[in-house]
Amino acid sequence: MAQCVQTTTILEQKEEKTVTLLVPQAGKRKFEIVYFNIITFAYWHIAGLYGLYLCFTSTKWATVLFSFFLFVVAEVGVTAGSHRLWSHKTYKAKLPLQILLMVMNSLAFQNTVIDWVRDHRLHHKYSDTDADPHNASRGFFYSHVGWLLVRKHPDVKKRGKEIDISDIYNNPVLRFQKKYAIPFIGAVCFVLPTLIPVYGWGETWTNAWHVAMLRYIMNLNVTFLVNSAAHIYGKRPYDKKILPSQNIAVSIATFGEGFHNYHHVFPWDYRAAELGNNSLNFPTKFIDFFAWIGWAYDLKTVSKEMIKQRSKRTGDGTNLWGLEDVDTPEDLKNTKGE
């Protein structure tokens, strides 16, 4: 496979220099409601739920299958693109793959990649504190969607200005998306998914639009689950002192982003999980494929020994879905990494 994995020595040095996260906290604050956002999110979800109803009553099967395909494409655009490539730089991508991922990410419409990366790097640096945009210490609803319905916490504004995203601003592909955000993202996320069923196989405008909205809110909410459910429910086999958890349900919904305790301990691993090539981690397979054809390279991983030592030192003792799980077959434990 055409990939260059970072050496264990470098990774171990990075591990030793990792700054301990602040203790999860949520100080008292007065929420300033953004009514425009509430109305917008309410419409999206009402329209999406109506789209779900139409799927069972009048929508053509071609439209349903097309929307599911777009759901998968958009989700990979977020996980393999804005998350693993641009936020954490877990691998490098040549221009064709960057363009492809930018378009796929636009289909998800979760702000521009530049804004997404800024918020996500802030989230990792100040995870589950008042400087975290979607602080899970404030509960499920706030970390899931509530943070988007109110003004940003002062600490988020202050710390956000200190986050280095110069590498992202210097990327011409992402600058294009930022400059033409409204027409470009609007066309990719809403217009084309509506027009294609109408002109492609004679779907009604009502069905096409509302099923497109259903696909959109599904993409939103499965991503939101990483911020909420995967920070509240689950085991913590790698670091028991942080909120991010291993949540299998979230992994299924997001195609592999629910191994969140691992990800917060080893954010530079392109697999975002210890067992990165299992069936729940489609973005890893996506990246591996493009590494095979030469569009992705310098894939970074973590050594098994490093994972084992960190788990023993700071984990909660569960170590589910890991090589130290007592139920893991011996032949898997003895398998050598790539």
UniProtKB/Swiss-Prot annotation:
Task: Specify the protein's topology with respect to the membrane.
Answer: Multi-pass membrane protein
Q: Which cofactor does it need?
A: Fe cation
Q: Which GO terms describe its molecular function?
A: acyl-CoA 11-(Z)-desaturase activity; iron ion binding; stearoyl-CoA 9-desaturase activity
Give me the segments passing through the membrane: 33-53, 61-81, 97-117, 181-201, 212-234
The entry's free-text remark on domains says: The histidine box domains may contain the active site and/or be involved in metal ion binding.
Going by the UniProt record, its keywords in alphabetical order are: Fatty acid biosynthesis, Fatty acid metabolism, Iron, Lipid biosynthesis, Lipid metabolism, Membrane, Metal-binding, Oxidoreductase, Transmembrane, Transmembrane helix
Transit peptide listed as a keyword:
no
Q: This protein is called what?
A: Acyl-CoA Delta(11) desaturase
Q: Where is this motif: Histidine box-2?
A: 120-124
Query: What's its job?
Result: Catalyzes the formation of delta(11) fatty acyl precursors in the pheromone gland, and has high activity towards palmitic acid and stearic acid.
